[in-house]
Amino acid sequence: MGEMVSFSSNGGTAEGYLAVPDTGAGPAVIVIQELWGLVGHVTDVVDRFAGEGFVALAPDLYHGKSTSEPDEARKLNMGLAMDAAARDIAGAATYLTGRVENTGRGIGCVGFCLGGSLALWSATLSQDIIATVGFYPALPWARMSPTWSRYAG
């Protein structure tokens, strides 16, 4: 159902898996990967969101790498620069905001495990992200630097 697309991020180009609903338009959501990378489960979730009427995008935060081995997944996670991941997520939000198929007033963001943490953090990364859901997040706040000031007052 979906396809790999490229979008601007980190002063270069990032990739992600995009699926558009059969109706051709709908609100947009970012789906953030688990520890394993952009694997079949994540692309299936993106396709299911599209099946429910959403324009869905999963950015590839490991840039082409994925695994089913726990030790390798931990290595990939430890090598993930949170500032680069943040820019990839913000880039995905900007990309979705500019898609003609996006009929929403903002972007939603969901994630699983590592992605659950990043989904919750994403609301502080881009003003376009207006709703987040983190499924079983592990919150490595020491590796993140959320800016909560935009929610003050």
Question: Where are the predicted features?
Answer:
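Serine-hydrolase catalytic machinery in alpha/beta-hydrolase-like enzymes
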Residues: 4-102
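A catalytic-pocket lid/entrance helix-loop region that shapes and gates access to the active site
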Residues: 77-80, 149-153
